[in-house]
């Protein structure tokens, strides 16, 4: 077998592989000898079929098997012998001419094919001792815990039907039909809808006009959708809602006690407070971790500048761009609404894709050198977490992970990345800094605003932008969730 390099430009490689017809003939004869005593052909005793007849009957099918085996097995062997790793699966090209193909299968012509691929760039790791980051630390006060527990209590409070007029804080149960220009519109109708007056859940003006209604009342409400309402067909439009009030209920007292905890399935009020404190710590910890990670990745980005495989960048960019367009379509907005243009947005996301690929390769190299591994238990827990997100689809999800090799990689990549970050935190200079809740959130909001000005509408998963959330190359798409119930048009939470 001859292996001839025909292209070596940057990271691009093209290899021509030639297997002489005689070698193919020899391999075929070996296979024919193996099957000689096993096949049954009319007119011949077992093991007595002439070689020429065997070749005539089975030659082409055996050669086709050999060709498939060579194409399946040799690319990885060739790359290994060259000391190369391909960024993606090599592209394989062979003759499409029928006459040439027939000659190859008849062992009358050399079998040739071409491998085209990009190699992963060599990365010489640098010392991370110079990386300095600040870890923001927050002390969670008892008052903040109590405030959150009160919100839990309010959401779990009981309501009791009353006969009087509805006031702010009361919960009404209603049917409604929304119309624009006299025509009903999608999402504008509901039955048995519950609304706490004064909650601000519905569009401005809707709740105010229900103050004073009683059970059994019929009322037509006129409101105007906000100019920035996500559904462009409704934004700025005047609408009427025919409302039929079914029930008015007054709120019960909000008390933090063991009875409340029991209602929530928790043993005591003290335990409820512990759980809420843990949730707050987790939320702040997640935000602190994200900002800490961003600092590390920003500095790694400055340290490493090298050519990235176009195939990986294109795959990353296409994933981001697809999500960006989906987000725009769902929100009914355009690039102009986001104070940018499609051209500028493409440039921004191309840069983001390059950064993510480059950082992914760097983190991969750091992790490999440090011996970072994702354990089977960690993979199983991650897959279980995925199953919990798709109730009723557990079997399909498990089958997806079994049948799609890339699916497991998509689960492994973020776990591996976080473990590499954990490793780096033991190697770099980390300074803890106490901050208030307001300082932490104010800084985060400031960063978000700055991001919005310089980039196009953000992809929720991909546009961690400067955080880079660097994945390891192309990841398999996860199974889609079942669509969530649509928000009603009057409901402000739809925004």
Curated annotation (Swiss-Prot):
GO terms for cellular component: cytoplasm. This is Trigger factor. It comes from the Bacteria. Residues 169-254 form the PPIase FKBP-type domain. The keyword Isomerase applies. GO terms for biological process: 'de novo' cotranslational protein folding; cell division; chaperone-mediated protein folding; protein transport; protein unfolding. It is found in: Cytoplasm. It comes from Rhizobium leguminosarum bv. trifolii (strain WSM2304). Involved in protein export. Acts as a chaperone by maintaining the newly synthesized protein in an open conformation. Functions as a peptidyl-prolyl cis-trans isomerase. It catalyses: [protein]-peptidylproline (omega=180) = [protein]-peptidylproline (omega=0). Its main location: cytoplasm. Residues 78-97, 441-495 are annotated as: Disordered. Consists of 3 domains; the N-terminus binds the ribosome, the middle domain has PPIase activity, while the C-terminus has intrinsic chaperone activity on its own. HAMAP family: Trigger_factor_Tig. Pfam families: FKBP_C, Trigger_C, Trigger_N. It is an enzyme of class 5 (isomerase). Its EC number is 5.2.1.8. GO terms for molecular function: peptidyl-prolyl cis-trans isomerase activity; protein folding chaperone; ribosome binding. Keywords: Cell cycle, Cell division, Chaperone, Cytoplasm, Isomerase, Rotamase. Belongs to the FKBP-type PPIase family. Tig subfamily. InterPro entries: PPIase_dom_sf, PPIase_FKBP_dom, Trig_fac, Trigger_fac_C, Trigger_fac_C_sf, Trigger_fac_ribosome-bd_bac, Trigger_fac_ribosome-bd_sf, Trigger_fact/SurA_dom_sf. Transmembrane segments: none annotated.
